[in-house]
Amino acid sequence: KEGYPVGRDGCKISCVINNNFCKVECQAKWRQSDGYCYFWGLSCYCTNLPDDAQVWDSSTNKCGG
């Protein structure tokens, strides 16, 4: 599984071009995962996630309220 990790505010975790920052963010939630900064979305993106990992979903988006 893969997807955008969600911050405490329910939003995607923002980044600019810092892949290491995103890798740390992903591994803090899911130890075996990897991550990078998705340039077009300016958000961290995690890969190699467990099936039950909760990631950002446009249909359940709670960002900003």
Swiss-Prot record:
Tissue-wise expression: Expressed by the venom gland.
Domain named LCN-type CS-alpha/beta: residues: 1-64
A GO molecular function held by the record: sodium channel inhibitor activity
Location in or out of the cell: Secreted
Gene Ontology, cellular component aspect: extracellular region
Biological processes annotated in GO: defense response
CDD domains: neurotoxins_LC_scorpion
Role of this protein: Beta toxins bind voltage-independently at site-4 of sodium channels (Nav) and shift the voltage of activation toward more negative potentials thereby affecting sodium channel activation and promoting spontaneous and repetitive firing.
Name of protein: Putative beta-neurotoxin RjAa7
